[in-house]
């Protein structure tokens, strides 16, 4: 990780305290401390040991050679929260941790409420970092549900209590998050608690939330210690979920760990296959990561993807409030195996590049294959994707679409897919806040990755695009990103400017 000077670290740390309150709103007060305090005196670099999978940015593709692009949706937001944790402390995250699609999908966009399970929309506008290119924004939204419409829940909390979890930004924060989630559930919802370290323990059998005191007492009793050798931890969690399966309900494992994924299945392929088998039986898996230094990001993402789930990185109280309170409906899938396919018109588009989604690209023939796994969309959740496109030299005033946007999804696992289709036209001279904000977030991600495709993107461009897109910001997360950028240290600003100049 890139070293930042002592004074820069202190300034950034002060911003961390002011921008993210660590005093819990949960009445139980399980978490008492500030994340930054766990690092003590300024250090040469953030804790080492985090593991990421390197990848190469998607390239431009000639429409004459391949006019069709297919990818699975990705509703995770872990990459953005991980970046925020590093940048707010004066450091840069590993570029392999920066996944632009997760930056985009951390935020909710102002998309129309769909009549059915999913709605789609799109627009085309100018590309801020290349005046000769256009940007195509794709949007999807899962149908919102009210509190009364939430499905009955059967949750299994699978908690890592190994010694590595014994720091303020790990187990205490996780306990506070789970206590907060319990307060949000309905009296007839069910919660189980399984822990693992040197051994596996079913600390709490499935219990209705009307007995919240019993559930909370079990959560408060959690303490960290011992090695991480999980035995049959994840298998036990799945068996617990199946034993209390609610037909037509939200059956889900919520796993909290610092990322050392030793849960009893040591072979990666065996683990992924097991998770897939249980996913096919209707058990979803939500991964929640905490802390740094032991972080196996690549495994966490793969497992959550195969488990029909979500992947979050929780670095502060505001983040667990986002995940378990403000966006709790996102834990209820309304669309399964959701795929997008874009077919470009070669008379209007010469080349295109999908920004992000590198590990979610699919073969074109997989789009119509209902046996192929893809991502889920939660209730009220929005998904955003961007293509940078190179227009042809001959542009026509004829009403010819730039592309056709097809989306396939299943309302329930095991059912046949439904398909939505939208022809994409565009007025290049106009844009919307949705497009400007998406462009700003993508440009920031490309700067952090020092992408060869960043063009003229720079920090001031990013701040201008985001700052002009704040009218729709119901929970203040867009403003939070702008505040982060405005409080970067001089060293961080200089580094971003150096990357922009290359």
Language-model features: locations:
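Low-complexity, Pro/Ser/Thr
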Residues: 21-42
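C-terminal motif of bacterial Sec signal peptides marking the signal peptidase cleavage site
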Residues: 16-19
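Exposed acidic/Ser/Thr-rich ligand/metal-binding surfaces
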Residues: 21-27, 118-338, 392-397, 412, ...
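A broad, low-specificity signal for short, low-complexity segments enriched in glycine/proline
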Residues: 31-35, 96-102, 153, 215-217, ...
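Repetitive helical segments and hydrophobic/amphipathic motifs
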Residues: 11-12
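Short, structured protein-protein interaction patches enriched in aromatics and acidic/basic residues
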Residues: 102-112
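An acidic, Ser/Thr-enriched
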Residues: 35-75, 79-97, 111-122, 129-136, ...
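Positively charged n-region of N-terminal signal peptides that target proteins for export
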Residues: 1-6
């Amino acid at each position: 990780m890139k070293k930042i000077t002592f004074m820069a670290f202190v300034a950034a740390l002060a911003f961390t305290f002011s921008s993210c309150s660590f005093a819990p709103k949960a009445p139980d007060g399980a978490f008492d401390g500030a994340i930054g305090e766990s690092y003590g005196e300024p250090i040469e670099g953030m804790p080492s040991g985090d593991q990421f999978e390197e990848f190469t940015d998607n390239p431009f593709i000639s429409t004459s050679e391949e006019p069709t692009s297919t990818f699975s949706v990705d509703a995770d937001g872990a990459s953005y929260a991980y970046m925020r944790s590093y940048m707010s402390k004066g450091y840069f995250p590993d570029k392999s941790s920066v996944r632009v699609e997760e930056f985009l999908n951390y935020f909710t966009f102002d998309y129309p409420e769909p009549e059915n399970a999913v709605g789609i929309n799109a627009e085309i506008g100018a590309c801020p970092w290349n005046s000769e290119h256009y940007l195509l924004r794709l949007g999807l939204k899962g149908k919102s549900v009210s509190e009364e419409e939430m499905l009955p829940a059967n949750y299994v909390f699978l908690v890592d209590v190994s010694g590595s979890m014994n720091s303020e930004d790990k187990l205490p924060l996780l306990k506070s998050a789970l206590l907060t989630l319990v307060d949000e559930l309905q009296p007839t919802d069910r919660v189980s608690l399984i822990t693992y370290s040197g051994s596996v323990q079913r600390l709490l059998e499935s219990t209705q939330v009307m007995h919240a005191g019993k559930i909370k007492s079990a959560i408060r009793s959690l303490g960290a210690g011992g090695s991480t050798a999980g035995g049959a931890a994840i298998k036990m969690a799945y068996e617990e979920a199946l034993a209390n399966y609610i037909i037509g309900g939200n059956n889900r494992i919520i796993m909290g760990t610092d990322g050392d994924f030793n849960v009893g299945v040591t072979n990666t392929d065996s683990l992924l296959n097991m998770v897939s088998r249980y996913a096919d039986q209707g058990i979803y898996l939500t991964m929640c990561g905490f802390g740094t230094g032991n972080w196996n990001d690549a495994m966490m993402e793969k497992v959550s993807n195969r488990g029909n789930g979500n992947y979050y990185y929780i670095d502060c109280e505001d983040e667990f409030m986002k995940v378990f309170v403000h966006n709790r409906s996102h834990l209820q899938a309304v669309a399964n195996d959701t795929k997008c396919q874009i077919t470009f018109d070669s008379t209007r588009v010469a080349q295109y590049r999908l920004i992000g989604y590198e590990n979610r690209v699919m073969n074109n023939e997989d789009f119509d294959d209902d046996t192929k796994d893809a991502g889920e969309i939660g209730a009220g959740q929005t998904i955003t994707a961007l293509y940078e496109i190179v227009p042809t030299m001959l542009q026509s005033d004829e009403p010819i679409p730039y592309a056709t946007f097809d989306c396939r999804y299943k309302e329930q696992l095991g059912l046949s897919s439904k398909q939505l289709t939208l022809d994409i036209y565009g007025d290049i001279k106009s844009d919307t806040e949705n497009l400007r904000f998406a462009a700003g977030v993508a440009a920031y991600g490309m700067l952090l990755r020092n992408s060869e495709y960043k063009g003229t993107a720079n920090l001031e461009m990013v701040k201008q695009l985001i700052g002009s897109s704040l009218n729709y910001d119901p929970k203040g997360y867009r403003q939070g990103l702008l505040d982060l950028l405005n409080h970067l240290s001089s060293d961080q600003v200089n580094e971003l400017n150096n990357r922009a100049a290359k």
